From Swiss-Prot:
Gene3D superfamilies, sorted: Nucleic acid-binding proteins
Family that this chain belongs to: Belongs to the universal ribosomal protein uS12 family.
Oligomeric and partner information: Part of the 30S ribosomal subunit. Contacts proteins S8 and S17. May interact with IF1 in the 30S initiation complex.
Residues carrying 3-methylthioaspartic acid: 102
Alphabetical UniProt keywords: Methylation, Ribonucleoprotein, Ribosomal protein, RNA-binding, rRNA-binding, tRNA-binding
Family matches, as InterPro entries: NA-bd_OB-fold, Ribosomal_uS12, Ribosomal_uS12_bac
RNA-binding is among the record's keywords: yes
One Gene Ontology cellular component: small ribosomal subunit
Classification via CDD domains: Ribosomal_S12
Name of the gene this protein is made from: rpsL
Name this protein carries in UniProt: Small ribosomal subunit protein uS12
One protein family per Pfam: Ribosom_S12_S23
Molecular function terms from GO: rRNA binding; structural constituent of ribosome; tRNA binding
Record function comment: With S4 and S5 plays an important role in translational accuracy.
Length: 139
C-alpha cells in the first residue's frame, strides 16, 4: 500500500479497457484525409470474400463469414448469421459489434434484412435478429 507522500507525487490511475469492436470506434475524414475518432453502432461495408470456417475444438460445423472493407477503410471479418444467405463479392452489408465465441478473430456480425443481406426465409421465432418479416395470418 502506498504512503501519502507517494500518492501526492503520483496519483492513482484507473485502468483503461480496450474496446471489443475497434473498427466501429473511428471513421475516415475525407477532407482531412485521416482517421477521426467517433463511435458508431453500425458501419457499412463491401464484401471482399465470402467463405466458410470450421469452429474451435468441441464444436463441428461450417460457419459462414465474410471479409468486409468498411466505410472507414478498415478490413474486418464478420459472421453471417442464420440459415442460407445470398451474399457474394461486392455485396453491400451493414455490420455491428458482437463476437462469435467459437470462431477466432471474428468480432462482428452482419445485420440481416438490410442492404444486400436478405432476411432469413421461413423464420417464425426470433425474426428481428434475422430480418424476417412477420408471416401473414392464415384463415
Amino acid at each position: 500500500m502506498p504512503t501519502v507522500s507517494q500518492l501526492i507525487k503520483k496519483r492513482r490511475t484507473s485502468k483503461t479497457t480496450k474496446t471489443k469492436a475497434p473498427a466501429l470506434s473511428y471513421g475516415f475524414n475525407i477532407l482531412k484525409k485521416k482517421a477521426q475518432h467517433y463511435a458508431s453502432p453500425q458501419k457499412m461495408g463491401v464484401c471482399l470474400r465470402v467463405t466458410t470456417m470450421t469452429p474451435k475444438k468441441p464444436n463441428s460445423a461450417l460457419r459462414k463469414f465474410a471479409r468486409v472493407r468498411l466505410s472507414n477503410g478498415s478490413e474486418v471479418t464478420a459472421y453471417i448469421p442464420g440459415v442460407g444467405h445470398s451474399l457474394q463479392e461486392h455485396s453491400s452489408v451493414l455490420i455491428c459489434g458482437g463476437r462469435v465465441k467459437d470462431l477466432p478473430g471474428v468480432r462482428y456480425h452482419i445485420i440481416r434484412g438490410t442492404l444486400d443481406a436478405t432476411g432469413v426465409a421461413n423464420r417464425k421465432q426470433g425474426r428481428s435478429r434475422y430480418g424476417a418479416k412477420r408471416p401473414k395470418a392464415q384463415k
